[in-house]
């Protein structure tokens, strides 16, 4: 028997076919969220205050400093925040110190800075009662980047860009004549030498002395420069030129130019490279990173002893560079100090490191390599040394020295996680607040003012609220199942503020890059316009302090070439320097390689190389893919397009009533379920004392009792049912981090997205055509694929001009039968079964006072009370929303609930539906093999096996060959073996069961060796002609259910302006009869059908009502009138100043009557407006989902009587 037994958690053992030993545990899968937020709370927030403070007033009299901050206890717990539609947040208090420099007086005060949203343990935020996830963003890293493009003659043109975190961009470029230019902040270009002169190096000799006189592009640029032979101060002239480019039309002076350039580049408040920008810039420009492979044109000696380190003519190898590195790190080695002229922007001396080498393109030419000195990582702004060194790099590229950058390389793209995104948002708020504080400082009396009076927290609160509420990266959490949650938290988006837009992103950005290996999943990405822009973090990847993605590798000892268990995490640009063996390379027990030649990766190349060259080895075969992709068994046998669909569709699997973990899994299911946040996890070790459906109590070793409350029938974001079930028994010992209770889509601690039905690949009466699925009625009867869905509905009683709305049982014109499940307040009881149109909350709204008729006056005189003028505005069950009332929540002002202004009472009703699998539901396996149910076949009619077992699902064999997802067949056969042997299997991706293992397992289970069997037709008892592949496969029911999609309308709401029916199920709209459908009717000459579609059934408002009357009264249907949209068109053309008239056959003008001029009793504009006013409350529910044009849900009075 191949394989070995492995325990997953305490409750599940599987036979695993993996051959590679796990040297590294999977990390906590949501640490990208939690670590980033913790950093923000501990360091990021303080950094922000230190950046903005101290704030000084314009006269320098007052100074406001930051001392400390603290977060107090949150107002609500996580569950309370969810229930009250509130935020899970804690009050932020900041201690500020105000110093009066004139009197020396110091005032300290604690200032409230608003409520700050807290992250839950699951890595989410609760905003307005809904769980949200902040998606990490993938952006270009700040730094300096060089690019190369060939012109039409095939000559290389180089360009460079300095990208800051915030501030002005600096770009270099050469034109067709090889003259170099610079652009500041995307303005017009100016010769590069003008920038050098503005930095204080005014004469041509200084420039040639610094950069070397042999550079062709430099001499051409100097020739082009207008100040070439100017006698007066060239520095000032250059400054004026730059000012003219940046501020055209304004009077130019050297002083204004200096202050403008200082503000643009050298003011830390305006220009920020961030630590990562400084790190990247130093890595690109420092001398020690640029010498490798160059031929020295001077002898290098130790400055202290004079010992020769390298001779002129030596080529710098790795060994020589290692020897030189300690010297290159010194401040006094090959360092030249240049002093700019006094008119320069920055007058401090500039220290550069400079070494002469020979040009690669012309080995007789000597060119300098200039490094930017030793600028510490704390310097977040650009320095003149950076600009000069980057210009030198630019000139050197034309000599063949240095390399251009690939912007899609993950060394040049970084992750902005929650913490940094929040920090940036907070910075915006604080910067707005700073302006207000400065203004208040100058207005208020300095002797009496306190910090509290200066601070206005509104901009800070608003920017945080805006970020959580409406940022593109703050998303409503995908809560279909635990895998969907987990993947959402690990998602990386290139979209969003400061990122790309869908329309501008080309193929290169979206494509898989070799640096994605072990960092971003090459498989899991959406289909459609976002493909390649939204990615998923690989399973072992982590994000370092600079925001670059790292992936772990096992170090290979360079002495004896053995693989050690020492793990190094490498970023993409570090990895480029190493050769890395694959995880499945055969090893001996002592860690040495079995073969002398092994397959390895060198950048984007796969090579076979000697063991001596190997630096690292992969940690695990699954480090390449994300968690969802790693859940697909036999992934290596599937075509990547189908694997992509498989990974995406697992996230859409609906939690079933009684799920089963897959018989054939990959072994990552336990970790995925554990880290997703839906399971109940033990915090500390102990012994289980009590278990029921609602709570588990664990006695800790020190005697304290921990009570874990389980989640019961909670509605998730996606309207699914989230429920926890205990899996531990009384007396059982649990360790910290053990699973105590399964969440939704879990079984025995493992992810269980679907079921393991018996599947045959066969055709059946054409019901398999085009990916359709024929299923056994047993799956319906036994609730195998039954799921519970919970929908919530709200009704608010508001204060109106005519008096308050009232929740009551006494609703006008409603029979007792409709009120049978309502209590005295008109609210439905929990447990009642409701159907479409039933009342959930009885509510009446006061109507306007009207003139009383004689009869009403008589009644009023007799009974002394006016018959109540109210309208029925009850909340009713919408179409397709019937079910069992699962919960009712009532919020009132008296109970201290926070309600929006004008609302007295709010009732929320939860309706649970039990949905069995039915025709039209979408199902899928894990290999992208999706289809819809086409027929439910009675159990007795299904094909059955020789032992009488009927098949559960029949799939079309045509769905396999062309799609090349062969993994489903291997899963089918191994699943059959597991089913017959009564065990669970694990076959990890890229390291799972081989073909031989699968057939050995089939043979061991006693099933025919080819995995096929004779099936008998359930209707005739005859055997089918050929043997059929039968087995067990994990099959899911997806969230695309026919109940949510089916929709029908006779009459309903119309759009206000065009009077055409609305569209879409959410608005109870009609089916659009579009341009092409009209052509089809025209082709048949179906004139009358076409006419009624364009008039009665659409926007002929008068005709609609008359037609309705005629049908009711059994009369012939009248002639149609003029469609409203035609009138709209005429009015729009008239608004353009065109004289539009409608003429008849005799060229006589037809007067189009307005709707309210019609003599018949029809619905006119005023009636519609009044009706809309009355029904506003009714239609509040639709407003959220209403994605159409500005619509008003108005239904004609008469039409609505039915």
Curated annotation (Swiss-Prot):
Signal peptide (from-to): none
PROSITE patterns in alphabetical order: RNA_POL_BETA
Catalysed reaction, written as an equation: RNA(n) + a ribonucleoside 5'-triphosphate = RNA(n+1) + diphosphate
Enzyme Commission number: 2.7.7.6
Biological processes per GO annotation: DNA-templated transcription
Region named Disordered: 1154-1202
GO molecular function: DNA binding; DNA-directed RNA polymerase activity; ribonucleoside binding
Keywords of the record: DNA-directed RNA polymerase, Nucleotidyltransferase, Transcription, Transferase
GO cellular component entries: DNA-directed RNA polymerase complex
Basic and acidic residues composition-biased segments: 1171-1188
Known function: DNA-dependent RNA polymerase catalyzes the transcription of DNA into RNA using the four ribonucleoside triphosphates as substrates.
Database matches in HAMAP family: RNApol_bact_RpoB
Similarity comment text for this entry: Belongs to the RNA polymerase beta chain family.
Assembly and binders: The RNAP catalytic core consists of 2 alpha, 1 beta, 1 beta' and 1 omega subunit. When a sigma factor is associated with the core the holoenzyme is formed, which can initiate transcription.
PANTHER family given in the database record: DNA-DIRECTED RNA POLYMERASE I SUBUNIT 2
Name assigned to this protein: DNA-directed RNA polymerase subunit beta
Organism: Limosilactobacillus reuteri (strain DSM 20016) (Lactobacillus reuteri)
């Amino acid at each position: 028997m191949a394989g070995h037994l492995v325990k997953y958690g305490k409750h599940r053992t599987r036979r695993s076919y993996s051959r590679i030993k796990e040297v590294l545990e999977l990390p906590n899968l949501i640490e990208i969220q939690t670590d980033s937020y913790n950093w923000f709370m501990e360091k990021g927030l303080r950094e922000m205050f230190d950046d903005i403070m101290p704030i000084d007033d314009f006269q320098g009299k007052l100074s406001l400093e930051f001392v400390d901050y603290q977060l107090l206890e949150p107002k609500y717990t996580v569950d309370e925040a969810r229930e009250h539609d509130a935020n899970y947040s804690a009050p932020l208090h900041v201690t500020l110190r105000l110093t009066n420099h004139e009197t020396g007086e110091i005032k300290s005060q604690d200032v409230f800075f608003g409520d700050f949203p807290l992250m839950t343990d699951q890595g989410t935020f609760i905003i307005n009662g809904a769980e949200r996830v902040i998606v990490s963003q993938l952006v270009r890293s700040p730094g300096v980047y060089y690019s190369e493009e060939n012109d039409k003659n095939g000559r290389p043109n180089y360009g460079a860009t300095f990208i800051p975190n915030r501030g002005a961009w600096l770009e270099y470029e050469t034109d067709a004549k090889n003259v170099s230019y610079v652009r500041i902040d995307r303005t017009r270009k100016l010769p590069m030498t003008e920038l050098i002169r503005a930095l204080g190096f005014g004469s041509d000799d200084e420039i040639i002395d610094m950069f070397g006189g042999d550079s062709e592009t430099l001499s051409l640029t100097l020739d082009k420069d207008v100040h070439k032979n100017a006698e007066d101060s060239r520095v000032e002239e250059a400054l004026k030129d730059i000012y003219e480019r940046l501020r055209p039309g304004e009077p130019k002076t050297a002083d204004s130019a200096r202050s403008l350039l200082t503000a643009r580049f050298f003011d830390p408040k305006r220009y920020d490279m961030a630590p990562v920008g400084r790190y990247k810039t130093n890595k690109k420009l420092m001398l020690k990173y640029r010498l490798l492979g160059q031929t020295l044109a001077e002898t290098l000696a130790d400055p202290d002893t004079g010992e020769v380190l390298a001779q002129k003519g030596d080529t710098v190898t790795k060994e020589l560079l290692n020897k030189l590195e300690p010297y290159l790190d010194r401040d006094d080695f090959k360092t030249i100090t240049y002093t700019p002229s006094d008119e320069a922007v920055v007058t401090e001396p500039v220290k550069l490191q400079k070494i002469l080498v020979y040009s690669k393109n012309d080995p007789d030419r000597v060119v300098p390599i200039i490094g930017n000195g030793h600028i510490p990582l704390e310097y977040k702004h650009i320095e003149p040394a950076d600009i000069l060194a980057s210009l030198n790099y630019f000139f050197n590229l034309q000599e063949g020295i240095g390399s251009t950058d690939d912007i899609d390389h993950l060394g040049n793209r970084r992750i902005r996680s929650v913490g940094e995104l929040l920090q940036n948002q907070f910075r915006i708020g604080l910067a707005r607040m700073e302006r207000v504080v400065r203004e208040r400082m100058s207005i208020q009396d300095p002797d009496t003012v306190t910090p509290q009076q200066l601070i206005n927290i509104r901009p800070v609160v608003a920017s945080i609220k805006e970020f959580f509420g409406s940022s593109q990266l703050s998303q409503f959490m995908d809560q279909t199942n635990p895998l969907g949650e987990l993947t959402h938290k690990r998602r990386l988006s290139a979209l969003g503020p400061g990122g790309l837009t869908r329309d501008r992103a080309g193929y290169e950005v979206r494509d898989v890059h070799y640096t994605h290996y072990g960092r971003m999943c090459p498989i899991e990405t959406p289909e459609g316009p976002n493909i390649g822009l939204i990615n998923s973090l690989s399973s072992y990847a982590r994000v370092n302090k600079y925001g670059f993605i790292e992936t772990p590798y096992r170090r290979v000892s360079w002495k004896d070439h053995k693989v050690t268990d020492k793990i190094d995490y490498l970023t993409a640009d570090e990895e480029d320097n190493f050769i890395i063996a694959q995880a499945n390379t055969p090893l001996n027990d002592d860690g040495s390689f079995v073969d002398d030649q092994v397959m390895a990766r060198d950048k984007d190349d796969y090579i076979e190389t000697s063991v001596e060259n190997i630096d690292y080895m992969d940690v695990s075969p699954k480090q390449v893919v994300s968690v969802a992709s790693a859940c697909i068994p036999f992934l290596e046998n599937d075509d990547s397009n189908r694997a992509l669909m498989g990974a995406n569709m697992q996230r859409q699997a609906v939690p079933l009533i009684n799920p089963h973990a897959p018989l054939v899994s990959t072994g990552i299911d336990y970790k995925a379920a554990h880290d997703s946040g839906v399971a109940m996890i033990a915090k500390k070790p102990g012994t289980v004392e009590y278990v029921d459906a609602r709570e588990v109590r664990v006695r800790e070793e020190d005697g304290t009792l921990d009570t874990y409350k389980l989640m019961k029938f909670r509605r998730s974001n996606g309207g699914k049912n989230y429920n926890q079930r205990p899996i531990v028994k009384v007396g059982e010992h649990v360790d910290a981090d053990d699973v105590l209770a399964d969440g939704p889509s879990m079984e025995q601690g493992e992810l269980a997205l679907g079921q393991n039905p018996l599947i045959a690949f066969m055709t059946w009466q054409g019901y398999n055509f085009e990916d359709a699925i024929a299923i056994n009625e047993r799956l319906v009867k036994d609730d195998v694929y039954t799921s519970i869905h919970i929908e919530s509905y709200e009704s608010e009683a508001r204060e109106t001009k005519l008096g308050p709305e009232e929740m009551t049982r006494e609703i006008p014109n409603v029979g007792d039968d409709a009120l049978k499940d309502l209590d005295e307040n008109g609210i439905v009881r929990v447990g009642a079964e409701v159907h479409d149109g039933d009342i959930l909350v009885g509510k009446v709204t006061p109507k306007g006072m009207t003139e009383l008729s004689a009869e009403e006056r008589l009644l009023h005189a007799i009974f002394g009370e006016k018959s109540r003028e109210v309208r029925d505005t009850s909340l009713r069950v919408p179409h397709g929303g019937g079910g069992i009332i699962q919960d009712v929540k009532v919020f009132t002002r008296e109970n201290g609930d926070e309600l929006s202004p004008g609302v007295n009472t709010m009732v929320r009703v939860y309706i649970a539906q039990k949905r069995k699998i039915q025709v039209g539901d979408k199902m899928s396996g894990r290999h992208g093999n999706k289809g819809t149910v086409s027929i439910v076949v009675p159990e007795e009619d299904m094909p059955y096996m020789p032992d009488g077992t009927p098949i559960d699902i029949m799939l079309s064999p045509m769905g396999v060959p062309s799609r090349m997802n062969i993994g489903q067949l291997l899963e089918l056969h191994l699943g059959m073996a597991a089913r017959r042997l009564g065990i669970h299997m694990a076959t990890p991706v890229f390291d799972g069961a081989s073909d031989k293992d699968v057939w050995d397992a089939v043979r061991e289970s006693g099933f025919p060796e080819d995995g096929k069997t004779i099936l008998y037709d359930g209707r005739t008892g005859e055997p089918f002609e050929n043997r059929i592949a039968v087995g067990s496969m994990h099959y899911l029911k997806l969230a695309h259910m026919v109940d949510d999609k089916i929709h029908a309308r006779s009459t309903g709401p119309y759009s206000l302006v065009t009077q055409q029916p609305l569209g879409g199920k959410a608005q109870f709209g009609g089916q659009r009869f579009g341009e092409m459908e009209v052509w089809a009717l025209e082709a048949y000459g179906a004139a009358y059908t076409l006419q009624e579609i364009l008039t009665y059934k659409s926007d002929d408002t008068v005709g609609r009502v008359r037609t309705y009357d005629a049908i009711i009264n059994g009369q012939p249907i009248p002639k149609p009138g003029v469609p409203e949209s035609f009138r709209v068109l005429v009015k729009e053309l008239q608004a353009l100043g065109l004289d539009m008239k409608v003429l008849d056959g005799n060229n006589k003008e037809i007067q189009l009557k307005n709707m309210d001029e019609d003599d018949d009793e029809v619905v006119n504009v005023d009636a519609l407006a009044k009706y809309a006013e009355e029904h506003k409350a009714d239609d509040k529910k639709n407003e959220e989902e209403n994605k159409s044009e500005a619509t008003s849900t108005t239904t004609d009075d008469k039409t609505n009587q039915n």
